[in-house]
């Protein structure tokens, strides 16, 4: 291998786009037969085991759009802002309610999104 230092590698990675980084991670996972998500799952499972089985608390929540209500356009705008979906996709999500808007998020974020959607006139639940 040439004279490539760790600093050179870090600098190279720092200049990559998000798409390039994603592709790099996938290639590294394939080359070494590992998954970047595995350590996170193991740490979460380990943390739950340390806390004990007595009080098992839900850590991931789903925000479900139950109904759009009377202010459908406002709800579509909020769904677009929250999810980053295009107009067509956001309208389809609102039309097909009940549908999840966001899944697997922390409670604080779920409550914030619920409040945003309710302010726009939607009926929302957090599960």
Curated annotation (Swiss-Prot):
CDD domains: Ribosomal_L7_L12 (cd00387). Homodimer. Part of the ribosomal stalk of the 50S ribosomal subunit. Forms a multimeric L10(L12)X complex, where L10 forms an elongated spine to which 2 to 4 L12 dimers bind in a sequential fashion. Binds GTP-bound translation factors. Keywords: Ribonucleoprotein, Ribosomal protein. The gene is rplL. GO terms for biological process: translation. InterPro entries: Ribosomal_bL12, Ribosomal_bL12_C, Ribosomal_bL12_C/ClpS-like, Ribosomal_bL12_oligo, Ribosomal_bL12_oligo_N_sf. SUPFAM superfamilies: ClpS-like (SSF54736), Ribosomal protein L7/12, oligomerisation (N-terminal) domain (SSF48300). It holds the Pfam family Ribosomal_L12_N. It comes from the Bacteria. One of its GO terms (cellular component) is cytosolic large ribosomal subunit. GO terms for molecular function: mRNA binding; structural constituent of ribosome. Belongs to the bacterial ribosomal protein bL12 family. Forms part of the ribosomal stalk which helps the ribosome interact with GTP-bound translation factors. Is thus essential for accurate translation. This is Large ribosomal subunit protein bL12.
């Amino acid at each position: 291998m040439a004279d490539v230092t760790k600093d050179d590698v870090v600098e190279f990675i720092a200049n990559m786009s998000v798409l390039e980084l994603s592709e790099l991670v996938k290639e590294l996972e394939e080359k070494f037969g590992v998954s970047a998500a595995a350590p996170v799952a193991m740490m979460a499972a380990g943390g739950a085991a340390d806390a004990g089985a007595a009080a098992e608390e839900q850590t991931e929540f789903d925000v479900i759009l139950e109904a759009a209500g009377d202010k459908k356009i406002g709800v579509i705008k909020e769904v677009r802002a929250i999810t980053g979906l295009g107009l067509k996709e956001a309208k389809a999500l609102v039309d097909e309610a009940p549908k999840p808007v966001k899944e697997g998020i922390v409670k604080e974020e779920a409550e914030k999104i619920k409040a945003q959607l309710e302010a726009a006139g939607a009926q929302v639940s957090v599960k």
